[in-house]
Design a protein with these regions (language model features):
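Non-catalytic substrate-recognition and accessory regions of acyl/acetyltransferase enzymes
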Residues: 1-95, 100-122, 126, 130-157
Length: 157
């Protein structure tokens, strides 16, 4: 099996080795990933396989509101870790790399939730990726509509 490595971004992705997952809105987010990492608005990782840069992903902390349950002490807010996106270059998609990255992010989130008050790992899935996330153990959940990501399905694990 090839070596998978996630490394925190230390600079913008060079224009000489661009990454495109084939979805313009996600490709645009990759362009801002390093800036968001510097400003502590998220943590972007470059994804390497056998030393080659083949993708990028981002996680961040979010605060969600769960008004449906009544077991909260004072309010209905809780912290969650969000996978903002996973982008694998379209030239290497279909080889299981995204599945390995997702498994790694799930494992890392489970470890963090043991030392930090993180309740869920959440994401907004594109319609054509919902089954992929279901297969990884995610479920859908009700969430207030987020107009920034209107064509997505909220999911959590």
């Amino acid at each position: 099996m090839s070596e998978l490595r996630l490394a925190v971004m230390r600079e913008d992705i060079p224009s000489s080795s661009p990454i495109s997952c084939g979805i313009a809105s996600i490709d645009d987010r990759i362009k801002d990933a390093y800036s968001k990492t510097i400003c502590k608005q998220g943590l972007a990782y470059n994804i390497y396989v056998d030393g080659y840069l083949i993708g990028n992903c981002m996680i961040k902390l979010v605060v969600l509101c769960d008004e449906a349950n009544d077991y909260y002490v004072t309010d209905h807010e809780y912290a969650a870790l969000e996978i903002s996106y996973i982008a694998i270059d379209r030239r290497v998609q279909g080889n299981g790399i995204g599945t390995r990255v997702l498994a790694r992010l799930i494992s890392d989130a489970e470890k963090l939730s043991k030392i930090l008050p993180i309740r869920f790992l959440v994401l907004d899935a594109l319609d054509d990726k919902v089954q992929w996330y279901l297969d990884a153990g995610f479920t859908t959940y009700p969430k207030r509509e987020d107009l920034r990501y209107a064509d997505t399905v909220p999911m959590r694990i």
